[in-house]
Design a protein with these regions (language model features):
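Structured catalytic cores of enzymes that bind and process phosphorylated ligands/cofactors
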Residues: 15-16, 29, 73, 100-105
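Donor nucleotide-sugar recognition loop
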Residues: 172-180
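Short, high-confidence coil segments that cap the C-terminus of an alpha-helix
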Residues: 21, 68-70, 97-101
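Conserved core of the sugar-phosphate nucleotidyltransferase
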Residues: 83-172
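Short phosphate-binding loop-to-helix
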Residues: 25, 31-90
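N-terminal glycine-rich phosphate-binding loop and ensuing alpha1 helix
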Residues: 1-28
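A conserved hydrophobic position in a structured secondary element of the catalytic/binding core
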Residues: 28-29, 83, 160, 179
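Residue-level signal for alpha-helix termini/capping positions
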Residues: 17, 63-67, 96
Length: 180
């Protein structure tokens, strides 16, 4: 999809590259996306079509191509053209500083419509979000549910340490994940 005369994936790729967080790869089973990225001068790797999650796809690239490097691997969704490079950098910095094995990002909702929008993933937490600490997520969901806890807009980016990623892909999918 073109946004400002540029494919969506290229906006995401440029943000990831501008974060100066390390090598950027597009992992996809879609040859058209691979061609777009490579024509732009980016790195794209064709992955299996059989993955159940994006994290499984990222692990395939990590396992086959990165020789157990780097220590933190970021899974960034390809349909997020507005992701800021600072957000990517901040996730990695916080994970390193706080020795977190897994991290993700969330933000305040910009409107009530976002809370009711089933296309926007919500994250439920007990504490207010701030820049200086990570919070433990209680749940992630799409539909607006009544909660006595605090809800934020989940941003589709995940960071894993090498060890956590290797463990995560071996886990069985949870009942909640399968239901959704």
């Amino acid at each position: 999809k073109l946004i400002n005369n540029k494919e969506m994936i290229l906006h995401v790729y440029e943000s990831a590259s501008a974060s100066n967080s390390g090598e950027v790869f597009v992992a996809t089973p879609n040859q058209k996306i691979i061609d777009v990225v490579r024509d732009f001068g980016g790195k794209a790797i064709k992955t299996s079509e059989n993955h159940k999650t994006g994290t499984d796809r990222v692990f395939e690239v990590f396992e086959k191509n990165l020789n157990s490097e780097p220590n933190i691997i970021v899974n960034l969704q390809g349909d997020m053209p507005n992701i800021e490079n600072k957000a990517i950098s901040k996730l990695i910095e916080h994970m390193k500083k706080n020795q977190c094995d897994i991290g993700t990002l969330a933000s305040n909702f910009s409107s009530k419509n976002e809370i009711d929008n089933p296309n926007i993933v919500k994250v439920e937490v007990k504490e207010k979000l701030n820049d200086s600490k990570f919070l433990n997520a209680l749940d992630f969901f799409r539909n607006n549910k009544v909660s006595k806890n605090i809800l934020y807009h989940h941003i589709g980016i995940y960071g894993f340490t090498r060890r956590a990623l290797m463990m995560y892909v071996k886990l069985n999918r949870s009942k909640l994940e399968l239901e959704r």
